Amino acid sequence: MAAFPAYLALLSYLVPGALSHPEAKTLTSRASTEAYSPPYYPAPNGGWISEWASAYEKAHRVVSNMTLAEKVNLTSGTGIYMGPCAGQTGSVPRFGIPNLCLHDSPLGVRNSDHNTAFPAGITVGATFDKDLMYERGVGLGEEARGKGINVLLGPSVGPIGRKPRGGRNWEGFGADPSLQAFGGSLTIKGMQSTGAIASLKHLIGNEQEQHRMSSVITQGYSSNIDDRTLHELYLWPFAESVRAGAGSVMIAYNDVNRSACSQNSKLINGILKDELGFQGFVVTDWLAHIGGVSSALAGLDMSMPGDGAIPLLGTSYWSWELSRSVLNGSVPVERLNDMVTRIVATWYKMGQDKDYPLPNFSSNTEDETGPLYPGALFSPSGIVNQYVNVQGNHNVTARAIARDAITLLKNNDNVLPLKRNNTLKIFGTDAGTNSDGINSCTDKGCNKGVLTMGWGSGTSRLPYLITPQEAIANISSNAGFHITDTFPSGVTAGPDDIAIVFINSDSGENYITVDGNPGDRTLAGLHAWHNGDNLVKAAAEKFSNVVVVVHTVGPILMEEWIDLDSVKAVLVAHLPGQEAGWSLTDILFGDYSPSGHLPYTIPHSESDYPESVGLIAQPFGQIQDDYTEGLYIDYRHFLKANITPRYPFGHGLSYTTFNFTEPNLSIIKALDTAYPAARPPKGSTPTYPTAKPDASEVAWPKNFNRIWRYLYPYLDNPEGAAANSSKTYPYPDGYTTEPKPAPRAGGAEGGNPALWDVTFSVQVKVTNTGSRDGRAVAQLYVELPSSLGLDTPSRQLRQFEKTKILAAGESEVLTLDVTRKDLSVWDVVVQDWKAPVNGEGVKIWVGESVADLRVGCVVGEGCSTL
């Protein structure tokens, strides 16, 4: 079972049952120097959004007739390795609801076959192409559906990339909330157009891999984030993705403001379900469930994979324990009904009740036959892999994304594009393949050959791999290859020869350590791996023309060689997936002009970043990760600190040039009030009888054949559990069953719909002024006035558009819309979004990077070219 070692590695980070982590204790930490997450109860019911009304009506009819066992079955996983998927719920055969399959990953079906390994999220972000973001989502959804996956665990919009060394930044779309928001929301729309359910992750503050999970000696770290920073930065892409209709949200491992995400009532009940109007279901990250009653009351709807503190022992915080909690009254039956209704309504909303496939693969083995429940001591066997090919023509989309993401940082003397008759010398193992096999390392937990993706659960097996070496050899008959990370002796260099040096930087999830890096880039830092810097310098000493190709998970330091005279060009190819070679040669040899742009800043030194975004650790006690930099991460920090980076956010050159002319700013809807119009009232939600179910509903069925370690909803003594209903149970601090007033910032999925009123529109004419075809990206940044009374970043990306391929001399007019929310700050006192009245003092900039602004507009004064 290929995935088994990976999950065994998780055991070192498990949450033990004896670990003291009660919500009540967390919520009483009120010292002014300590972060605090206030209580927010009860959990809001779903079903009040009109777009979900039909699905909730169907769910209500079914749930009204379910037994307690059937309800609990859908909220709890059946246990790790107790089915074909990363996790699966129980089923309700009486109503045609199967075991729901939840499975990775954000870039392709994990641990499967005949699937596409798409470029990673960071690569998609670098395209700045909304159409490709959506198309990739469609491809992911089609492949998930084809494999029988009900819930695909992605996209990831958290981490956002606060910490440049963070291990999983590459799963998201870039170090900016708007870029993440467009990437996440468009991916969700694409995925769910196919009927697959997207599970948006990780809510929230999982910005570092090390110490995120609790262990026998310490709790996972607490991400301590102030309310304004939470809303304007980290929550922003989640809000946009909820607005896109996300069916599921995955909760992170860590704490937020000293309250574990899986039972953080403010985060789940207050912000996600009430303020953002989330209508789907909330699921744990795998083994992130640390308590039973407290998590249910805090708004958690599904536990995955269902196991308790130590997997493989057949224990659970829910399953039969949830049945017990409902019978004894510690979990109100109303809460269970809402949990189940949310799950079933999402199933109906995506049309999964109509001819949706069952799982036809196994993530546990590549064999055709095997145990149906691999985690059981004794398991029946059968066909587990049907080898269904779901790739379709998705390789075309994968290649287009990988190609359009390639970012040209430098091109002195126009050394690129190459001519097919150039004499080339290629260096670096990153140009080649993994000699052990392209899928030989579990979850890509090694760095051998071309880097196509990071490592961890967010990966996919490669159906094939076109390496740069193969692709270049296919085009050039004058290429010599030195697939080594040590510069070979005896290499000769003619005056016109061109050296292409391949280097990379890797990272991933913390259950695998690669070359001393436990997920985060702890040992390597932001330097190239495998002697990369020295390899470039050695080539630069020998050759007059050096092209550097970088495959990387994020920012990488280049100072040792970037200014060398012979280093003429640098391409960042990000994480290209299976089409690594063809996408690169499309650009290298000029079939296409590069049109990618950096989705993060590349610094001169790691010391350019604020100290607070470094990796944090301590030997004992819970780590307090204080977000003292506030809104100022990545380019926002560089601008505030007046630090010129090596390459700014949004930077990307082309083989041609573009002019931005004829800018025009139009008022679409007046900002005549500081705060948005009053939110619409909540609609009605499903109602159910409030009487406790009969204990017999969770009694073991007669002659039932139990599977060892399978997690069931049944109790050995249900009558005994019901008899305890007269007892008084302790509840989390602040718990109440009285509904709270509807938050004024809410009113629809994502928040008050007035926030998305388009207030201004900028039009700009983009002209190809060069001699080659190419595409330009217009990036719109806003600067908010000091009249708001708050410190705000001097530039904030809020919109972007990409031209079609423009021939030399051809133009296209782009329209970039700006919403009320785009111009708002979060008022922590009023608890609403505040904008400058009439947009007074707002400045809008449009350009090709945050440092290359071509157009400036001032509301009320108009626009000019810069």
Curated annotation (Swiss-Prot):
UniProt KW keywords: Carbohydrate metabolism, Cellulose degradation, Glycoprotein, Glycosidase, Hydrolase, Polysaccharide degradation, Secreted, Signal
Question: What enzyme class is recorded for this protein?
Answer: hydrolase
Q: Per its record, how is this protein called by name?
A: Probable beta-glucosidase F
Q: Give compartment(s).
A: Secreted
Q: Which residues form the signal peptide?
A: 1-20
Catalytic residues, per the record, are: 285
- Which biological process, per GO, is one annotated for this protein? cellulose catabolic process
Region (Disordered): which ranges?
A: 725-748
Give, as in the UniProt entry, the pathway in which the protein acts.
Glycan metabolism; cellulose degradation
